[in-house]
From Swiss-Prot:
The organism of origin for this protein: Corynebacterium diphtheriae (strain ATCC 700971 / NCTC 13129 / Biotype gravis)
Entry's family note: Belongs to the LysE/ArgO transporter (TC 2.A.75) family.
Gene Ontology annotations for the cellular component aspect, listed alphabetically: plasma membrane
Protein name: Lysine exporter LysE
PANTHER family according to UniProt: ARGININE EXPORTER PROTEIN ARGO (PTHR30086), ARGININE EXPORTER PROTEIN ARGO-RELATED (PTHR30086:SF20)
Annotated function: Catalyzes the efflux of L-lysine.
Origin: domain of life: Bacteria
Residue ranges crossing the lipid bilayer per the database entry: 4-26, 38-60, 65-87, 139-161, 171-193, 205-227
Subcellular location per the Swiss-Prot or TrEMBL entry: Cell inner membrane
Secretion signal span: none
Membrane topology: Multi-pass membrane protein
Chief subcellular location: membrane
Amino acid sequence: MSIAIAGFLMGLSLIVAIGPQNALIIRQGIKREGLIPILVVCILSDVILIFGGTAGVGALVDRAPIALVVLKWLGVAYLLYFGFTCFKEAFKRHGQALAVEQSEPVAYEPVADASSGVITKTRTKAQPKSAQRTWVKPVLAALAFTWLNPAAYIDVLVMLGGIANQHGPDGRWVFALGALCASLTWFPFIGYTSTRFSTVLSRPAVWRYINIAIGIIMMIMCARLIMH
């Protein structure tokens, strides 16, 4: 049990700090768009990284520094792009600001009355063309923030995997499960907490400051990547 708790605390220490992943989850939780797919991507990515590191894949990453350099600059480019979109959304006019609670769109469909032969229009719920695709961009962002981030490979594959292997052949997997429980707890917590308070947080003035804060976080993470 103590090994699992150690793994949980280690995993929590790596993901609690506000970084690109957490910022994205909070942002989409407030918007109520694509939250579940993002949580699935983040958790499955951690499953791969944590168990890959525990299995010893981190040693391969340590021997391929050029791969980390390529990932570094791809990550820098994406962080700059995402930060720009946050600043752009922050400075939209109030009329274009996020609205979480909107009335459902409706459409009118012609319906023929069999007895009178008169055609009337019936009010039905309209299906937005892009409604089923709102999760695509956030999911791609989650994938980019995870797999184009060299820190994910160093912190999880190399460092966490190395610490896990100090607990022996059996104990290392208990440690890994503890670390995974941290991801299973933290990501849904911040996502659904953001959704719970989305009515307040999505007000134009608040949403503007949130976007500015996330944009600044992206720029800080970008600078950290460049300097490492």
